[in-house]
């Protein structure tokens, strides 16, 4: 009788060890981030900076800014990407000279920059870009590669630590092999780290995360279906979103950067956070809801080991008195951001 009993004990012990190890693996994904990016999305200025414009960022605990040069596409269904290399019509802060100067000023103040080029699509948004023929797809990727390599070379020369290879190009990211070629081309001229900024509806479908250093998410997740939600509801929503994100993190073993996150100062900010301010003009203003959305994020996703950083949309060189708006500047959300960024 002793032998079967001993065997049973060994089986139960092995099962307990196996269960413990699996639970530990579930709790610890194995990603260790030394210092999270405490970032904001910097708005390129029309005119040259004087230097003081970045002073307040340090006092709010900001460690990084993302700078955004633009390319333009007139029709989302035609391969016609254009960008300005030198033009008097360009805003200074979006030019190579302006971004270089902004980076230098920031570094003097302990603030690093990442580069995040965007495509501006006339009458639409980048997520609708889709070619109707295979020939046009090849032309589009050829043009896009030239566009992103132009800025990757600038980033290499400027010692920019991270380049975002694309932003919200949802219909194009289905073409995995094309994107792998783009990534390969970028790595041939740029030695820093790479991220792709996937729309929150897109990141789970992307299959080339393994070729990048970070999983990037434009984190405009809907958090509520009503105006003026309370903090408990927002926290619950973020906990659910975090569990979904963790599935992708476990699959690819890559840290996440929220390449954008933001909320307007309106009562409906948590319903569809991505909606532009000019579509919210009839909605009552609410600094409280905006601040609660910030608080819910910081109490949940911000604490995750897999989150390498966040960039809040958006921050003006000179504060603007325009409501509604995404910026936390001079609002209650700014105080929430500072309290966590300063920890």
Predicted regions: what they are:
Residues 28-31, 84, 275-279, 291-296, ...:
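Aromatic-rich peripheral "rim/lid" segments of glycoside hydrolase catalytic domains that contact
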Residues 39-44, 80-96, 133-143, 166-173, ...:
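The substrate-binding groove and active-site-proximal loops of carbohydrate-active enzymes
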Residues 44-58, 141-154, 199-208, 291-300:
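Short, acidic/polar
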Residues 53-55, 71-124, 164, 175-195, ...:
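Aromatic-lined substrate-binding rim segments of carbohydrate-active enzymes
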Residues 63-79, 94-172, 268, 315-318:
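Substrate-binding cleft and catalytic face of glycoside hydrolase catalytic domains
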Residues 148-167, 198-236, 255, 259, ...:
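Aromatic- and acid-rich polysaccharide-binding/catalytic face
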